[in-house]
Amino acid sequence: MDSRAQLWGLALNKRRATLPHPGGSTNLKADPEELFTKLEKIGKGSFGEVFKGIDNRTQKVVAIKIIDLEEAEDEIEDIQQEITVLSQCDSPYVTKYYGSYLKDTKLWIIMEYLGGGSALDLLEPGPLDETQIATILREILKGLDYLHSEKKIHRDIKAANVLLSEHGEVKLADFGVAGQLTDTQIKRNTFVGTPFWMAPEVIKQSAYDSKADIWSLGITAIELARGEPPHSELHPMKVLFLIPKNNPPTLEGNYSKPLKEFVEACLNKEPSFRPTAKELLKHKFILRNAKKTSYLTELIDRYKRWKAEQSHDDSSSEDSDAETDGQASGGSDSGDWIFTIREKDPKNLENGALQPSDLDRNKMKDIPKRPFSQCLSTIISPLFAELKEKSQACGGNLGSIEELRGAIYLAEEACPGISDTMVAQLVQRLQRYSLSGGGTSSH
């Protein structure tokens, strides 16, 4: 067996005795190809491809996420985290997890099949009305109320991570960066999420709690109303500076006062002033506008008609390549702002989640980790210290220097190793510049 598969089996065996599994279990011996019939590909989830499937024992339709551990070596901890959180959840508002199976280097994760698409998909044919927005937000709030009561934080709430069944049921999905709080650890301070939806305190890496999900919900409310989050036209790195520094986004346009007030309540820069999910369920926008979830089937039908027309117009397009788990999706990649920043070095997670000490150190050597750039300590930090010293001496602007330094470190968080690449490219360009006589023309 491949070393990565061995590592996976070791970690799960270590954990299995302590983990509660309301929704499923992990089986390292059964052959998933005998237990399940894999049908058409329906999307791309976090870490792997998602297929529609049949449980041969019950004839139940399921979603099968298949991950090649050889190709997902950098994401093993995140995959384990997603399974850990899902296996601990038992709520009609959270995607159900039925079990995991390991076959050679392929991990099969069996989940609830949700054929209605994601909330992001439903935006593709056109805008939603406020009744539809309120109904979706109410169901997200029910999911968040459940998670927060279990001391869990989703940390990546956005329309792409909200899935619907064909009957209009709304469920939270994609728990690859979800966090667990305990009685002794009431806040977290790791930098994860998707930039446009991230709360200011998360970006600043301050201590944060479930109120970070409420901020993301407010951004999602704007996304559902306008089709995209605020600042979606900007580079994500720029947005990471704007969110903590600027006033909170507001919902502009021809929307009702209650919806605008709902968004404003969620997007308070001070986390303690944001309402809880339970309190937001009583907000007048929700109470006045939300209907039964069956009302959303009209949206799902609209999306399916739109998708069929798109396929007919462009038969060469591969509409099955979506980005969420278990959805019958139409490839709703609305731009570069969808990506999620995942935790690089998970802290000691509680309640049976993987601890660093649980892993065989020798086997861990088989999984190369992308290191942070060496130039951060050898070049970048000393350089900025020198710049700040010189700037102070002549009364310069220290804030701009700190912003530039922060941008480099945020880029490194998102893409470890990028600073070394940048410095190497700069050196090459400087060498070419000097060889060409300082860039002056010879004619």
Curated annotation (Swiss-Prot):
What's in the keyword line of the UniProt record? Answer: Acetylation, Apoptosis, ATP-binding, Cytoplasm, Kinase, Magnesium, Membrane, Metal-binding, Nucleotide-binding, Nucleus, Phosphoprotein, Serine/threonine-protein kinase, Transferase
Cite the InterPro entries for this sequence.
Kinase-like_dom_sf, PDC10_dimerisation_sf, PDCD10_N, Prot_kinase_dom, Protein_kinase_ATP_BS, STE20/SPS1-PAK
Q: Which residues bind Mg(2+)?
A: N161, D174
Establish whether keyword Phosphoprotein is in the entry: yes
Result when mutating T18A: Loss of phosphorylation by PKA
In this chain, ATP is annotated as bound at I42, G43, K44, G45, S46, F47, G48, E49, V50, K65, E112, Y113, L114
Q: Name one GO cellular component term.
A: nucleoplasm
Phosphothreonine found at: T18, T190
Q: Where is this motif: Bipartite nuclear localization signal?
A: 278-292
Q: Which GO terms describe its molecular function?
A: ATP binding; cadherin binding; metal ion binding; protein kinase activity; protein serine kinase activity; protein serine/threonine kinase activity
User: Where would one find the signal peptide in this protein?
Assistant: none
What residues does the Protein kinase domain cover? 36-286
Positions modified as Phosphoserine?
S320
**What is catalysed by this protein?**
L-seryl-[protein] + ATP = O-phospho-L-seryl-[protein] + ADP + H(+); L-threonyl-[protein] + ATP = O-phospho-L-threonyl-[protein] + ADP + H(+)
Mind telling me what this protein is named?
Serine/threonine-protein kinase 24
Q: Which cofactor does it need?
A: Mg(2+); Mn(2+); Co(2+); Zn(2+)
